[in-house]
Amino acid sequence: MENTSGNRKNNPAAKPEKYINIGLLAHVDAGKTTLAEAILYLQGSIRKLGRVDHRDTFLDTDAMERARGITIFSKQARLTLGDWQVTLLDTPGHVDFSAEMERTLQVLDCAVLVISGADGVQSHVETLWRLLRRYEIPTFLFINKMDQPGTDREALMAGLKARLDDGCVDFGEDRSREAWLEELAMCDEELMEQYLEDGGIEAEDISRLTAERKVFPCYFGSALKNEGVDKLLEGIRRYARLPEYPETFGAKVYKIGRDAQGARLTYLKVTGGCLQVKKPLKGKSREGEPWEEKTDQIRLYSGTGFQMVQEARAGMVCAVTGLTKTYSGQGLGAEPASELPVLEPVLTYRLSFPADVDIHRAYRMLRPLEEEIPELHMLWDASANEIRVQVMGEVQIEILQNLIRERFELGVGFDAGSIVYKETIADTVEGVGHFEPLRHYAEVHLLLEPGEPGSGLQFDTICSEDVLDRDWQRL
């Protein structure tokens, strides 16, 4: 790789060297963007608190976001936390834009999962939790809207432990220190032995358990009233760990976008070494074709504004111009490519256009949109002379229609959708798994039978609990 560290003199990106990327995730309407606003205000990054209902928040800047009051596109803001330089990434909470959220997880060092104290753990929260586990992201929880009547802190903590993880621990200052230490010690056998020996737990111990995803610090408050937000930030500063990076250059591309002038932006995190302006970058396209290009600009975005720098060092998230072959999930330099995403659309639609629109020209115009929203999986069906796309739901369809109309001046319709893939068995089938290493023996039979149409999936076991305990029969 030809990107190497150069002269860092007078480069604002070079100091300080402690960088951390924190993501905000939530079920829609949990108050995630309001929390982002409160964090930026407390740390002095903005002078005035905006509100989602007033359509003036710092990060939800797109007209469609402000009109709907939801986050559609992931955004970032820069702030300082002690001697750390923080990039705060606000992700969509609506399930229709969850693929955009998942792309951002690739570059996070830790996450804050925002939960509504009025609603508790909702279904999408469990999906987010599984994703955080898959990407091995240390996670803090902020239980928001505790100013609303009827919120029950103890019941909420019980729900978090039952539906997410028993390692969710209340870090509120009003609880007994002894009870808090005992609960922490229960999360790790090594720590329990240490606690029983000397009766103490150090901050570094908690930091280790948080990094290992054995402890998930929980903070309560109200983002709208700026209550509890300072304690959350103190907890992150005390217990989050800064990653260590190699000297060899590497970068992970997590998003492709375009600025107001239409310039292509490659959003990436430098995962090793240093990325410099005008230095050659090498990679391979999705089709496997090798390429070599130079970066024109390196931008550090905060909201809609940005600062241009000459280099981005390991740990920094930036947007780069001049690259035309990059794609979301691509690894550059020593960084490997990402695994395939978990969240994919379940519906496919045929696009329809007015009679005077050349469909071949429309297809060429829309192809760049797939770079920004790769889950569209845009397909040209030559035999039917039509364009098909995959989407997550009705809200995304409305947003896409607005986006295509505004950017390409094209009216587009989405015909009746169909399931991307659906198949069921037609007859009974039995599979057998046999396992017989030294001193062990097991044989499992799995019987699949077709059910009534629309009956869904049903599971049962006929193995007696006298032979095998129920805990070992969970499907």
Task: Annotate each predicted stretch with a short phrase.
Residues M1-L475:
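Structural and coupling elements of P-loop NTPases
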